[in-house]
Amino acid sequence: MSSQYSNVENLSPQTIRQVMRELQEMETTPPEGIKVLINESDVTDIQALIDGPAGTPYAAGIFRVKLTLNKDFPLTPPKAYFLTKIFHPNVAANGEICVNTLKKDWKPDLGIKHILLTIKCLLIVPNPESALNEEAGKMLLERYDDYSQRARMMTEIHAQPAKCGVGATGDAKDDGGPSTKKHAGLDKKLQDKKKEKLLKEKKRMLKRL
């Protein structure tokens, strides 16, 4: 998925080189559970795959996120979005992510890696006090078991490798290559059974809402 427009021509050559250098470093030595997807034709459109952290409702999911650099980057923070549907207090319906690092706590020297690690941490420790999804924030504070069940259901429906077109972040293929197709083939029967079960569970939950 590419951005509708690009700010690449508005960034200084120095900023472009700095961003590409950082992306290439992350591609060579990726942070744990994060795989950056480099778009060499447009460094203002950055995408990455984040593993759902163990012990959270997002565990076993793979979430695609997008950072869009504006013309004033790094003086101003990028916009961050989940492209994978997720039930989370700090993620709006359009996928926009609310985190202080990208607002009042932004510093020009933080870098792309720091942003992606912050987003991963947000999956571990949501902040219901600054919720973009008020329903999720309220549910987390008042009925955590219901919140966890809903978030887990969304993860199982939308954040599976077959949905993202990837295997795992360690060997992800963004181009639908052989390993992706092999993985998808092995998982197809399991995915079909899981889908039936999840649809039934979803219908039951919707009746209660």
Swiss-Prot record:
Enzyme Commission number(s): 2.3.2.23
Reaction catalysed by this enzyme: S-ubiquitinyl-[E1 ubiquitin-activating enzyme]-L-cysteine + [E2 ubiquitin-conjugating enzyme]-L-cysteine = [E1 ubiquitin-activating enzyme]-L-cysteine + S-ubiquitinyl-[E2 ubiquitin-conjugating enzyme]-L-cysteine
Region listing for Disordered, in residue ranges: 165-209
A Pfam family annotated for this UniProt entry: UQ_con
Keywords associated with the record: ATP-binding, Cell cycle, Cell division, Nucleotide-binding, Transferase, Ubl conjugation pathway
Database matches in Gene3D superfamilies: Ubiquitin Conjugating Enzyme
Domain UBC core: 14-160
Biased composition (Basic and acidic residues): 184-199
Any one GO molecular-function label of the UniProt entry: ubiquitin conjugating enzyme activity
Pathway: Protein modification; protein ubiquitination
Active-site residues (renumbered): C98 (glycyl thioester intermediate)
Coiled coil: none
Biased composition (Basic residues): 200-209
Swiss-Prot/TrEMBL GO biological process terms: anaphase-promoting complex-dependent catabolic process; cell division; exit from mitosis; protein ubiquitination
Function: Catalyzes the covalent attachment of ubiquitin to other proteins. Acts as an essential factor of the anaphase promoting complex/cyclosome (APC/C), a cell cycle-regulated ubiquitin ligase that controls progression through mitosis. Acts by specifically elongating polyubiquitin chains initiated by the E2 enzyme vih/UbcH10 on APC/C substrates, enhancing the degradation of APC/C substrates by the proteasome and promoting mitotic exit.
Family that this chain belongs to: Belongs to the ubiquitin-conjugating enzyme family.
Protein name: Ubiquitin-conjugating enzyme E2 S
